[in-house]
Amino acid sequence: MRPPSPLPARWLCVLAGALAWALGPAGGQAARLQEECDYVQMIEVQHKQCLEEAQLENETIGCSKMWDNLTCWPATPRGQVVVLACPLIFKLFSSIQGRNVSRSCTDEGWTHLEPGPYPIACGLDDKAASLDEQQTMFYGSVKTGYTIGYGLSLATLLVATAILSLFRKLHCTRNYIHMHLFISFILRAAAVFIKDLALFDSGESDQCSEGSVGCKAAMVFFQYCVMANFFWLLVEGLYLYTLLAVSFFSERKYFWGYILIGWGVPSTFTMVWTIARIHFEDYGCWDTINSSLWWIIKGPILTSILVNFILFICIIRILLQKLRPPDIRKSDSSPYSRLARSTLLLIPLFGVHYIMFAFFPDNFKPEVKMVFELVVGSFQGFVVAILYCFLNGEVQAELRRKWRRWHLQGVLGWNPKYRHPSGGSNGATCSTQVSMLTRVSPGARRSSSFQAEVSLV
């Protein structure tokens, strides 16, 4: 009887890499990965050698040479027992060395591995196996969580982008920037799904192989979309701060600068990272983050998070000054409630929550960081779409106007030549919204535009 094939060597290496990533310090991850790949290459060489020797052997009475995905068992006469050392791959799993495994050659062929499967026979204890099972369940839950989050965000963002695009009364610089931010969230969600499809569903998560061009292209697209999303969050901060800090400025001129920052800067860093990976680390699917090349991607993102957080503090400070005119009574708490409300509205728009883990080491609370950045972060696009489109007073008024018009056309067959009270010029709605801050803020155009941001509900 031929024994069932054990776990393939590549999957053992993937498990070893996962354990090393979760338990080991960040500085030793590159060395562990190299050691893991050395074992994979050694096992592949042994596999090839075993098959070649098996083809050259003459037929013998007994059990022929066999490869069980980890060990090459020599041809053996019936009735004998072969004892071999545990594969070296288990050095990555267990500190217990010197263990052996054996098989017996019987009339029915090779017996099962003794004293048990490789993990038991070679010292992979129950604690390590239980830890791996818990981590597998945890990673599965995280993947399910961010899949739901990105799916929900993708649906709401597509609708929100369509609304801002189709209604001409909503066309203005502020909403154009919102649309680009929505598109960056859409691309990020799509990139996550494409990356998961390339890495997990196609089975290309092995870091020791060369990796397909399609898988690498998916990772390049993913890195670009993530960085572009962070830079469009930065653009939102820059735009709001400019409205408050600059007396007169050309929105059209600044808008093209925002386009360059939001889409151009990420493309530059992504191209540099791609060229560096091709020349220095062209292995696997380019999904490793344990080398100095990762800073080509991580550095600009951290910079954008830090700058946006500083802008957030400055805007809150200016907003507090605007909400506290000299004639207001100290006992009046309404300005502070408006400030708290405005602050909560700006947090998802600026991505302020990313500052919590941005500058901690990669091995600091990895599970908490993973849940916060992947699961919670996946719902950011959904929250932004709700706050800055569906709960926006301008959008709701325009939707009600369109609904009344469609209703009259459908029920009465009437096609009114409707003209908006604002005079019909594009963008008028964006700069004339009455906000909760109007009573204490100047009526200037740039101030009213900012008020529209912090008083959407």
Swiss-Prot record:
Q: Where is the signal peptide?
A: 1-30
- UniProt keyword Disulfide bond, yes or no: yes
What GO MF terms are annotated? G protein-coupled peptide receptor activity; peptide hormone binding; pituitary adenylate cyclase-activating polypeptide receptor activity; vasoactive intestinal polypeptide receptor activity
This protein's superkingdom? Eukaryota
Tissue expression profile of the protein: In lung, HT-29 colonic epithelial cells, Raji B-lymphoblasts. Lesser extent in brain, heart, kidney, liver and placenta. Not expressed in CD4+ or CD8+ T-cells. Expressed in the T-cell lines HARRIS, HuT 78, Jurkat and SUP-T1, but not in the T-cell lines Peer, MOLT-4, HSB and YT.
Sugar-bearing residue positions? 58, 69, 100, 290
Show the InterPro entries listed in the entry: GPCR_2 (IPR050332), GPCR_2-like_7TM (IPR017981), GPCR_2_extracell_dom_sf (IPR036445), GPCR_2_extracellular_dom (IPR001879), GPCR_2_secretin-like (IPR000832), GPCR_2_secretin-like_CS (IPR017983), GPCR_2_VIP_rcpt (IPR001571), GPCR_2_VIP_rcpt_1 (IPR001771)
Where found? Answer: Cell membrane
Q: What is this protein called?
A: Vasoactive intestinal polypeptide receptor 1
Print the organism lineage. Answer: Eukaryota, Metazoa, Chordata, Craniata, Vertebrata
Primary gene name: VIPR1
